[in-house]
């Protein structure tokens, strides 16, 4: 029999952080699952803005949340910190962040992980399964029932990745430019992008990007436009969407095989702005590819704030009850969460999470190795 987990102290407080590329969300949650404070701030990935600068942003948000809760705005801010961050892609990065947060005295225990784990926990009752987050970038992680973990470095093209909103926007622009100068086939992406930026032609768009009259981030805006043009039947746009679908299917299939889950009924969680914005037919094709590898797989598109998953992982870590986790989900709906697309038989839409075990166990991580 497994070791029985000690119940958390009634005054235990979890500091949950979801640090994405565009925003940072913080929740303070007590051992009963009640939300004590919540704050949102700018994206401040330590890998982008620097370690101390990023942690300064996180800490101010934690202080603000603590003040909302009527707690002292000085460390320690809580019992346990669960920080799940975009850019925490390698063990060395996670260890550096844990050491820095420990030095700041945020809480007696601290866990740092990639934000894809928070999405997996938000979209499942037990943190077991496979998650793909496709937002600005793309990442995939898997956790087996025995705690084994498979993940990819997710460092972009240098680590073999393809996908994410910026990549898709770049592809849309690339095809539009080539249609404009004659090097590529005709595509409705060309007039759509010109109209989007209110330009006289596609070359004005290129010049504005080159001279930074348009910020580089504007390329990300083309991602929804790409899907619109594809839905209207444009062959070029459909080809880009197919490449994304195939990439997601490959990431999920590889993870399922590495974790030997093909004979099981794994939950596949799809999240991030790109996934929650696509049409059902795109999800259907992804689902078809997933069930080819694991016939009993269930694919879910989850539009829940990943910080809720971070908080659930924090409650797992302190040994909180199933009731506490259900309470958190219920409290989050309509305030932190923004709903779920698709069928969710375990009741994640209304906050119910029946049968929620106490956690996913010790994680033996692998990078492309079984």
Question: Positions of the model-derived regions?
Answer:
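Conserved beta-ketoacyl condensing-enzyme motif
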Residues: 78-87
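ATP-binding/phosphotransfer module of carbohydrate and carboxylate kinases, centering on a glycine-rich
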Residues: 2-78, 102-103, 122-128, 174-370
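Phosphate-binding/catalytic loop of phosphoryl-transfer enzymes
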Residues: 88-191, 325, 330, 337, ...
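Short beta->alpha junction loops/turns
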Residues: 86, 90, 165, 275, ...
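Solvent-exposed beta-strand sheet faces enriched in polar/charged residues
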Residues: 84, 113, 267-271
């Amino acid at each position: 029999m497994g070791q029985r987990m000690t119940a958390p102290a009634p005054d235990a407080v979890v500091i949950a952080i979801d640090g994405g590329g565009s925003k940072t969300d913080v929740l303070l949650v007590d051992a009963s699952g009640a939300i004590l404070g919540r704050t949102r701030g700018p994206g401040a990935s330590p890998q982008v803005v620097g370690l101390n600068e990023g942690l300064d942003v996180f800490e101010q948000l934690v202080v603000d949340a603590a003040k909302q809760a009527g707690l002292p705005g000085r460390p320690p801010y809580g019992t346990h910190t669960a920080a799940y961050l975009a850019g925490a892609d390698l063990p060395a990065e996670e260890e550096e962040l844990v050491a820095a947060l420990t030095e700041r005295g945020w809480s007696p225990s601290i866990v740092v992980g990639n934000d894809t784990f928070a999405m997996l926990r938000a979209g499942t009752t037990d943190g077991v399964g496979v998650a793909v987050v496709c937002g600005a970038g793309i990442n995939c992680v898997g956790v087996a029932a025995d705690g084994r973990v498979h993940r990819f470095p997710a460092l972009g093209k240098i680590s073999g990745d393809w996908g994410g909103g910026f990549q898709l926007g770049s592809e849309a622009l690339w095809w539009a430019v080539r249609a404009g100068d004659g090097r590529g086939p005709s595509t409705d992406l060309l007039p759509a992008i010109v109209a989007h930026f209110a330009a006289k032609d596609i070359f004005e768009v290129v010049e504005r990007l080159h001279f930074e009259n348009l910020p580089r981030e504007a390329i990300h805006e083309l991602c929804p436009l790409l899907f619109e043009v594809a839905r209207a039947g444009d062959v070029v746009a459909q080809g880009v969407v197919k490449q994304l679908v195939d990439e997601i299917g490959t990431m999920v299939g590889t993870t399922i095989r590495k974790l030997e889950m093909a004979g099981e009924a794994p939950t596949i969680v799809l999240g991030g702005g790109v996934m929650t914005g696509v049409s059902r037919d795109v999800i259907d094709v992804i689902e078809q590819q997933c069930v080819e590898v694991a016939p009993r797989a269930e694919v879910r598109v989850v539009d829940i704030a990943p910080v809720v998953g971070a908080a659930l992982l924090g409650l797992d870590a302190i040994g909180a009850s199933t009731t506490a986790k259900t309470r958190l989900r219920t409290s989050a709906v309509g305030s932190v969460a923004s709903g779920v697309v698709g069928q969710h038989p375990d009741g994640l839409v209304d906050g119910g999470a029946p049968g929620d075990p106490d956690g996913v166990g010790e994680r033996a991580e692998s990078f492309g190795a079984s």
